[in-house]
Amino acid sequence: MAPQNPLLGTWRVESFERWTADGTLTQPLGMPPAGYAVFDDTGHAFVQLGRATTTDLSPKDIAQSLMAYFGPYAIDGDELTVTVEASNMAAYIGSHQVRRFARDGDALTLGVEGQYRAKLRRVTA
């Protein structure tokens, strides 16, 4: 029997934090941010994060905050790798995006230490 997939389902982003070069922690997508990460049972990931439309930003600014990518994913211990098929971020296309993750019930934290951290909550399994 294969081990249960700890990421399977739809996860809503609750916070997105990024560290600046000098080590300052920022919230570039505002609070609360908007978006979801979906990990399906066929082994595909779909990630879309951005600023919430309730902010005082223009529609153009909100659209420019969007980070989206998708592709097949693999899990190895506490490490997630998404092989990016397409993205609105040119540098991601064809890359392997590797993230450490920790899950506590319906709460998920993933990111790259010293770069960024996203906290999400399970919507569906």
Question: Which ranges hold each PLM region?
Answer:
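Lipid interaction determinants
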Residues: M1-A125
